[in-house]
Design a protein with these regions (language model features):
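Conserved acidic catalytic loop of the alpha/beta-hydrolase fold
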Residues: 127-147
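Conserved strand-to-loop "acid loop" that flanks and positions the catalytic carboxylate
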Residues: 294-301
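Conserved alpha/beta-hydrolase "acid-adjacent" motif
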Residues: 303-309
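Alpha/beta-hydrolase
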Residues: 185, 189-292
Length: 360
């Protein structure tokens, strides 16, 4: 277990240094597309320091978003404190932000242009693993790095874990951040007895209710976040500029969002089906196959993962460490520094630094 008080101090120093750096246009963003054999394509944004040495001399880090909000809205908001990609680029990494198929600027299945009820849940674990594999192959060519490190948030951690378990040789270091695992069968909002369970087929995902994809309004992004912030004035915990940019970027990620009232962006339902299966005992991968260094980060007030998930991941992965951030929310990387973000960033940058030995 890591001493979070020391991480908080280190994180404050990192953020102070980055504040000075960020006063200049110090980062370069390059948007790329990966063509797939299926005639679909994946969107990837590269973020690096303007004065970063040649890519082969740096460590490459891939960021994988979760179930609803795509990569840019999750990891590269254009406001202070809103870009994990910039945080990691400031630490010397070359960072890649991926949109899986069905999300953001990547290709969407044709079924997402039809009524959601007309298809089964779209973009399941195998689809996500294939997309991550394509991104990793492309990043190897762009960066000269092999293997690369991966950071997955929530369902992104589930998908990244599935990829790393299947292709361990491709992953240098793996970060599983607020990620579900089969730590316990109890989950009020995602498990048995929740809206995700089919009332006519107990133990099965309610595919008829969720269909192939779902619509998400701006307001829907903040209910769970607000409920987990332990103070009345949410702006004291979460910068209002970050919250506004998060909602804006999520809606802009879908060109059809303004065709509905209120505006809403589409996200595939496969992540929900995967999550229900994991919670109800249909394990899709084993942490014992994660032979690379693994960092498990869990926010104490996370509504998605359970303490048992983090503990099971850290216990089963052969070379894992666990950081629990007190009072932090599911969105800690988008909260204020003193609301856990500094601790999160310190733990992450320390772990991803290839020059540092990992604490025992």
């Amino acid at each position: 277990m890591i001493d979070v008080s020391m991480l908080a101090l280190a994180g404050s120093l990192i953020l102070a240094a980055q504040g000075a750096i960020a006063a200049e246009p110090a980062f370069v963003r390059t948007d790329r597309f990966i063509d797939l054999p299926s005639d679909e394509r994946l969107f990837v944004r590269e973020v690096r320091g303007r004065n970063t040495p040649p890519a082969a001399e740096q460590s490459a880090v891939l960021l994988v978003h979760g179930a609803r909000v795509p990569g840019i809205a999750s990891f590269d908001l254009p406001v202070p404190g809103g870009s994990l990609a910039v945080d990691l680029a400031a630490a010397g990494h070359v960072v890649y932000v991926l949109d899986l198929r069905g999300y953001g600027a990547s290709s969407r299945p044709a079924a997402m242009d039809e009524d959601p009820s007309g298809s089964a849940p779209l973009i399941r674990t195998d689809d996500a693993v294939a997309d991550i594999a394509a991104a990793v192959d492309a990043i190897r060519g762009w960066s000269g790095n092999n293997p690369i490190s991966i950071v997955g948030w929530a369902t992104g951690g589930h998908w990244a874990g599935a990829f790393a378990a299947r292709y361990p040789e491709a992953v240098a270091r793996l970060v599983l951040y607020n990620t579900l695992y089969d730590g316990t069968a109890e989950h009020e909002t995602l498990g048995r007895g929740s809206p995700l369970e089919d009332p006519l087929r107990p133990g099965s995902f309610n595919a008829s209710a969720f269909g192939g994809y779902r619509f998400n309004t701006r307001d829907s992004l903040f209910s769970a976040w607000n409920n987990s912030i332990p103070i009345a004035d949410k702006n004291l915990w979460r910068d209002e500029r970050v919250a506004r940019a998060y909602g804006d970027a999520a809606l802009v990620s879908d060109a059809s969002s303004t065709s509905r009232e209120p505006p809403s962006f589409r996200s595939p339902s496969g992540a929900l089906a995967d999550s229900f299966e994991v919670i109800t005992g249909k394990t899709q991968w084993s942490a014992s196959a994660l032979v690379m260094p693994v960092l498990v980060i869990r926010s104490e007030k996370d509504f998605w993962s359970r303490p048992q998930d983090a503990e099971a991941l850290a216990k089963e992965a052969p070379e894992a460490e666990l950081v629990t951030i007190p009072d932090a929310t599911h969105f800690v990387h988008l909260d204020r520094d003193d609301a856990g973000r500094a601790v999160f960033l310190s733990a992450l940058t320390r772990f991803l630094d290839p020059s540092q030995s990992r604490p025992k």
